[in-house]
Amino acid sequence: MQKYLSDAMGTYESQAHYFSKPYFERELGNYQQTDYVPDLLTADIRYLAETSRLRQTVIDLAVQAFRNDYSRLPASLAELTSNGYLVKEPVDPFSGKGFTYQPNSDDYELYGSGPDLNSSADSGVEYSPVNGSVSPGVIRLR
């Protein structure tokens, strides 16, 4: 029993250290899942994916308000903060950087990197946890 408790505590301390860092600073291949402690990585990634979608929703609402007031899309997300639509630009919870915003003539693209930290939409792959927690793809609201 003592060995089991010792192993469990070692695993707990290892996971606590792993999750104490922001996602983009973690060594993604270094996560150790064991029978002693539940799989926290999957829960953490789901939380971060929903946080990404929520932050993109805030940006989307600010873009729509800007469009209603100026009859055009903002040239960049920085224009939303300088005009008071956002207090500060939301940050992608996976990469720690800003979301990708690409306006075109009548609409725009908005997305963040997924758990694989690849923020390129060129691949056309949307993140889906069905493909594994740390699977490729961007997280796109629209």
Model-derived segments and spans:
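Short acidic linear motifs
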Residues: M1-R142
